[in-house]
Amino acid sequence: MPSHCFLIGSLPLEVIDSPRVWRDKLPANYRPFAVDTTAGPDRAVLTVADRTPWQIPEGEAPLSEVFNDLGVTHLYRHPGGWLVSISPRPGDSPRLMLIDPSFARAELRVAGSDPMGAFVLDSMLRIFFSQYAATRGALLLHASAVELDGNAYLFMGRSGTGKSTHTRLWVNTFPGASIINDDVPLVQSDARGIPTVFGTPWSGKGCVWRRVSAPLRGIARLRQHPADEFIAAEGIDAFIAVLPGISVMTADADLYSRACTTILAFLNCAAVTVGTLLCTPRHSAAILSRSSLAPSDSQ
C-alpha cells in the first residue's frame, strides 16, 4: 500500500494512502517535507481507508463546532478515541476521521474517487498532526511567521486582522526578510531548549511551503488601529495573547494542559518578547514591530 513519509520540525509523519486519494502524485505543499522513511515507532501515522464510515449517533451534539477554511468541523467522543467530522462545503456529507487516545494514530475513511478527497486528507492531516505535536512538546500556531537576521517572529490575530499583510510589510521593508510560513507554523524547542519556528505544509492562501527554521525572537498579536502602537505583555498577559492561536482539542483535558504547559515553556525563554501591536497596514507598523520585538537588532 502507498506510504508517504514526512518530517515536520523534528516530528515524523506517515500517511498510508490505500485508496490513492493523492493519485500517486504528492501534492506540492508536502514535497519539501518528504523523506525516504520515518525511523522508529515514535511517529504520527494516518491511514486512509476506503471503508464504511463510522456512525455519529443520531441526535448527539458535538463537543465543538468550528467554521473556517477547512469547512464545518465537529468533534465527538468515540469508544475508540476522538471522532472528527468535516463537511468541506455547505450541504456536503461529513467525512470522518478517528484519532486514537494516544494521538499518534488516526484513520480517515474516504473513497479514492471522492472529488474532495485530497482536500479532506490535507485538512484532516493538519488537525491530526496538531494534536500529535502537542503530545510532543510542540505546537501548531495560527500565525504568519517571518525570518530576519536569523530570528523568527510570529504575528497572530483573528482571521482578516492582517497577519499576512504585516509579514509582507517586513519583506518589503527589511532587506533579507523572508516568510517561513503564512498560516500554521510549528513551534518546537530545539536540543538546547530554545523555542524554534519551523515551516509546515499548511500555509493557507500564501502557499509558502518551506522546510526552514529559525529561533523564535518575538510574538505580536495584531489589532487593526488608526495609529501604530506596541503594548508589551508579560506573565499571564503574554500567555493570553498566545493561547487563542493553538489548534488543540480543549475537550481532552490532559492534551489541553500539555499545550498550555508548552506555551509557558516558550514564554519563559528570556529571548522571546511578546506584545499586542495596534497597527495600520503601512511600513511604519513594520518598523515599530521590529524595534519593539527586537530592539537590539533594529539599530
Residue ranges with predicted function:
Residues 1-159, 169-178, 185-299:
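A noncatalytic interaction/capping subdomain that flanks phosphate/NTP-handling catalytic cores
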Residues 163:
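Conserved lysine of the Walker
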Residues 166:
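Hydrophobic positions on the alpha1 helix immediately C-terminal to the Walker A/P-loop
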